C-alpha cells in the first residue's frame, strides 16, 4: 500500500431544509390557520479516528465530502427530516488544519476519537411561526441556513514511543525487524527505507512499546536535502529518540553531532527529547575498533542486529526510558 501522510479535502455540511407555507384545510375548520412545518437541519460532517488506518491514501482519490441537506417542511406542522450525518475515518495521529488560515482545528491522537468538523445549517421556520394578531394567514417562511464548508489540510504524524534516527544505511530497518515483527525492506545500499515503518516491541510478558523507523536523513536535511525532512514529523510524538551510527563510520561522535544538529534545525521540540546513541553493525567493526565514550548526559549502547549482540541491553534501556517518560507525564495524585 502506498504511504500518504498529507492530504487536502473539501467538506460541506448539508443546508437546512426550507420552511413550509401551508394552511390547515379541514371540512369543519373554515379558518384553520397556518400549519407549515419547519425544514430539517442539514447533516453534519464528522472526523473519526480508525485504528485500522495507517495512511491518508483514501483522500488522494476522493477530495470532496458533502453531507445531505435537510428535507423541506410539510403541511400539518410536519417538520422535514434531518439530513444524515457523514463520518470520515482518519488514522490515529492526524493533525487537521484549516487549509486557508492553517489554524489547527484538531489533533486526533486517541482511538475512536470524534470531532464535528462542519455543522449542518438550521432548517427554516414554517409559516406557523409568523402568525400575528394582525396577520392570521402569513405566507412567509424561511429558507434553510447554509451548512458550513471548509477546506481541510490533514497531516499524519505517526504515534510511536521510540523514534529511530540515522544516516542512510545505519541499520535502522534491520534493528526494527529484529526487535519487532515489522518487516521493512532491507538492503545494503542507502535510502532502502522510503516510508516510515512502525514495529511493536514486546517486552517481557505483558509489556510493549512502539518503535518508528523513518528514512535516513543526511546533512542538510533540515534545509530540504534528502528524504528524511518530510518524515521527521513522524517522530515528533515519540517519547525518546535512538540515534543510530554504524560502527564502520570514520567518526562516530562527529556523525552523532551532525544528527543532533539536524534535529535542532528542524525544531518542533525534537532536540528536547531524551536521546540514546546506538552504535550499530558491531559485526563489521574494524579489528582495532574501540567504542567511544558517550556524550555527556546521553547513554550509549553498541549492538549487532545480525549477531544479536547487545539487543537485550538495548531493549531494557529503551523500556526503562519509555517507562520513565510515561511516569513523568502522569498527573500528580491529590495531596502530592
Curated annotation (Swiss-Prot):
Taxonomic lineage from the root: Bacteria, Pseudomonadati, Chlorobiota, Chlorobiia, Chlorobiales
Protein name: GTPase Obg
A GO BP entry: ribosome biogenesis
CDD domains from the UniProt entry: Obg
Signal peptide (residue range): none
MF (Gene Ontology): GTP binding; GTPase activity; magnesium ion binding
Entry-linked Pfam families: GTP1_OBG (PF01018), MMR_HSR1 (PF01926)
Gene source species: Chlorobium phaeovibrioides (strain DSM 265 / 1930)
Top-level enzyme category: hydrolase
Positions that bind GTP: 166-173, 191-195, 213-216, 280-283, 304-306
Composition-biased stretches (Polar residues): 129-138
Binding positions for Mg(2+) per the UniProt entry: 173, 193
Subunit structure: Monomer.
Family to which the UniProt record says this protein belongs: Belongs to the TRAFAC class OBG-HflX-like GTPase superfamily. OBG GTPase family.
A GO CC annotation given for this chain: cytoplasm
Gene name, Swiss-Prot/TrEMBL: obg
Function in brief: An essential GTPase which binds GTP, GDP and possibly (p)ppGpp with moderate affinity, with high nucleotide exchange rates and a fairly low GTP hydrolysis rate. Plays a role in control of the cell cycle, stress response, ribosome biogenesis and in those bacteria that undergo differentiation, in morphogenesis control.
Subcellular location: Cytoplasm
